[in-house]
């Protein structure tokens, strides 16, 4: 075998080894799930999540808790 043939065989072997080693890397990649980023959107807001109602509900819970912890003055 001459030197050029040996060099050609060596380069071919290196390319084949690189191709074999790099193939599993691309197979490990997985696309992320769609998660309904387009579907399932609602045009109107849900009345349960309106900012005014949320604040009113939080205040109501706080008033009830404070009334239970700090009762009013006793009447004689």
Swiss-Prot record:
It is found in: Secreted. One of its GO terms (biological process) is neuropeptide signaling pathway. One of its GO terms (cellular component) is extracellular region. It comes from the Eukaryota. Olfactory lobe and accessory lobe, olfactory globular tract, olfactory lobe cells (at protein level). Widely distributed throughout nervous system. The modification Phenylalanine amide is found at residue 39. Its main location: secreted. Residues 1-27 form the signal peptide. Keywords: Amidation, Cleavage on pair of basic residues, Neuropeptide, Secreted, Signal. GYRKPPFNGSIF-amide may be involved in olfaction and contraction of hindgut. Belongs to the FARP (FMRFamide related peptide) family. This is FMRFamide-related neuropeptides.
